[in-house]
Amino acid sequence: MAAACPFASPPLKSDFELSESSNPLEIYAQFDDLRTTCPVAYTSQMGGYWMLTRYEDVKNCASDTATFISSVKAVIPSDPRGTRRPPLNTDPPVHTPYRTAIDRTLKASRLKTLEHILEAHARREWRQLVDRGRGDVSADFGANFAAWVEVTWLNLADASAPVLARTAAAWVNAWREQNKEEVRFHSDKLYDMAKALFRDRRQSPRNVENDPASSLLAERVDGQRIPEEKLM
C-alpha cells in the first residue's frame, strides 16, 4: 500500500514545540518524553514538520527513499531564498553522481591520513579556548574546528580557515533567523571561494581519491560533465 503524504492534510494541533533551553538535560528530557508519549510528533513551527524520535523509525524511514524524499524539503528551516542544490536537495538516482564523487574522497584510507592533522587542529583550537579562560564551545571552538576540517578535506590554503569560519558562522545564523538578504550576502562569499577552488582544479587537477573538487570535475552524468551551477 502506498504511503500517504502527511502534508496533504497536516494536523490542526501541534504535538510539541522545540525547547528553547540551552541546557542539554532539558533538551534530552523533551526527546525522552516524546519517545514515550508521541514518538512520531508534529509541530507547526518553521512551516510545519514531523519528527521521529525512535531509532528504528529513523532507520526505516532513512532506508525508504521512495516514500521519504529530500527533493521537497531536506533542511528545517528551508533556505529563505528558495534555493535548492544537489546532492542534499535531490533523491536517487539524481544525487548519485555527486555522492559518488564526494564519497570517493571519504574512504577510510584517506581519513586515516587526515587524522593526525585534524587532531592537531582540534588540540590547538581547544588550547586557545582554555588559555583564554572563557568562551563559547560552539562559536569559539566548534565553528573554527569545523572550518579547519573543511580546509583540510578540500585541500585549501590554511589562510582560508579563519575566513571560512567567520563566513560560515554568519551564514548559518542568518539562515536560522530566515534573513534572506544576509543569507545571500554570506552565501555569495562562500560561492566565490568555491568558484576559485574549481577554477584552480580545472587548471591543475589533483588525485580524485584525495581531492573533492577534482573528483566532482571528473564525474559524468549521462556522459556529460556536471554543470557549473550544480558544482557549487
Predicted regions and their residues:
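Active-site substrate-recognition loop segments, prototypically the cytochrome P450 B′-helix/B-C loop
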Residues: 1-138, 142, 147-165, 169-177, ...
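Cytochrome P450 catalytic-core helices
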Residues: 231-232
